[in-house]
Amino acid sequence: MNDDIRPAVDSDTAAVKAVTDAAYHHYIARIGVVPAPMQADHAANVAAGRVFVTGDPVHGVLVLVPEADHLYLDSISVSPEAKGTGVGRRLLEFVEERARELGLPEVRLLTNAMMWENQKLYVHFGYELVERTVTGVYDRFHYRKRV
């Protein structure tokens, strides 16, 4: 199994969608809406250089957006088959490395208030809760981590 993390290419787009959908699908019943990462334009994100993948076949996906003062972790997805194998940890470590490479002082992300597992994970990895916002049907917790 290849665990290098690399920029996604056009031929990865279907796998990016498949892994993202598999990682988030079970939340639909819990939160009552399709999670935002499942609605993303994966082809556009890949073309813009925002997507990084790991595995052959792909079993981990990151969508990263560099901003002026932080790196925004738009989404992180691990296939159900790869859960518990350290893929998520390696992806989060990569996010921090990428922020440092870009000279950005922190990583920011948000997660749905009903995604309890994610909240525990981010706190475990040193992210701090900054605020909670409600926009339409999305109730979100915002986190940051200084790197």
Each model region followed by its residue ranges:
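Conserved glycine-rich acetyl-CoA-binding loop
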Residues: 79-93, 100-102, 113-120, 124
